Amino acid sequence: MDLLIILTYVAFAWAMFKIFKIPVNKWTIPTAALGGIFIVSGLILLMNYNHPYTFKAQKAVISIPVVPQVTGVVIEVTDKKNTLIKKGEVLFRLDPTRYQARVDRLMADIVTAEHKQRALGAELDEMAANTQQAKATRDKFAKEYQRYARGSQAKVNPFSERDIDVARQNYLAQEASVKSSAAEQKQIQSQLDSLVLGEHSQIASLKAQLAEAKYNLEQTIVRAPSDGYVTQVLIRPGTYAASLPLRPVMVFIPDQKRQIVAQFRQNSLLRLAPGDDAEVVFNALPGKVFSGKLAAISPAVPGGAYQSTGTLQTLNTAPGSDGVIATIELDEHTDLSALPDGIYAQVAVYSDHFSHVSVMRKVLLRMTSWVHYLYLDH
């Protein structure tokens, strides 16, 4: 573009010399040359500042590391690699034997606990009857003892001391039997009354364990979290998959709006605003330009991010970490769907300032796109 401007200026200057018959000497030639330098430099500087450009851009995509929630041996793996998978389709299965066994055992334990609860109810009824019988016997012995006690207070005692003592001991023994029976009845009642949300505590605990066991059993089938695709499926039946977040067994790429993430110079920040028009060219699609909008600007610069490490931090001066990150959303285009995620691109953003200069940036961007045809492998 700068060469085109220079050639245009040279043609314009030559025409001016011819039309106005300006003499060619040591003053007019340097003046025309300096004028061209100032004009071309001014236009390029205006274009660079008001219509930012960067070659550090990429078709970004968010991936989901697939980590099983349970541990086990892989018995089945999907054969849909790099093809669209619907949400809920099976990615792979783990051996469910031990998880199914735990579910079956807990279901049996719940049946046993429910039977035990019913047995406790019957035992409570039996114990209540025993308590009533013990009370009746106690009342009988109490009356007999009172009769012996009243006889002992008469002038002529018809009972011996041994008979009175035996009646007293029978009454006290039966009173203890009543208390023991009542205590056992109360203990059984307390077991029946230990409720959690209206359900017996032991049964509620077993049902909670059963719900967890069923969840773990369901997790032996790993499904697609959304529409998308998997690539580089490296697991095979027989692989031991562990529930470790730092060791995913598969990477899932969800179906999402395709965005371009670009890194601009900090000098361009004042000319980057959400909603500005943008154009993108890809190395993989020479000669084609795609339009879009500047969607967002990251509120943080990567080079300024720090984490606590227990040591004093220094300034991060690593190359490439000082740029402003911006997101560009592209308009719908059939060619974009065929592009693999992660490919590189070049981006130009057109601000409202000095909009007439943006034509220079557009021409340069298209020239860059055509240059992508030229490469040499050797």
Swiss-Prot record:
It is a multi-pass membrane protein. One of its GO terms (biological process) is transmembrane transport. Residues 17-26, 78-378 are periplasmic. The lineage of its organism: Bacteria, Pseudomonadati, Pseudomonadota, Gammaproteobacteria, Enterobacterales. Residues 48-56 are cytoplasmic. This is Inner membrane protein YiaV. Belongs to the membrane fusion protein (MFP) (TC 8.A.1) family. It comes from Escherichia coli (strain K12). The chain crosses the membrane at residues 27-47, 57-77. Gene3D superfamilies: 2.40.30.170, 2.40.50.100. GO terms for cellular component: plasma membrane. Residues 1-15 form the signal peptide. It is found in: Cell inner membrane. Keywords: Cell inner membrane, Cell membrane, Membrane, Signal, Transmembrane, Transmembrane helix. Pfam families: CusB_dom_1, HlyD_D23.
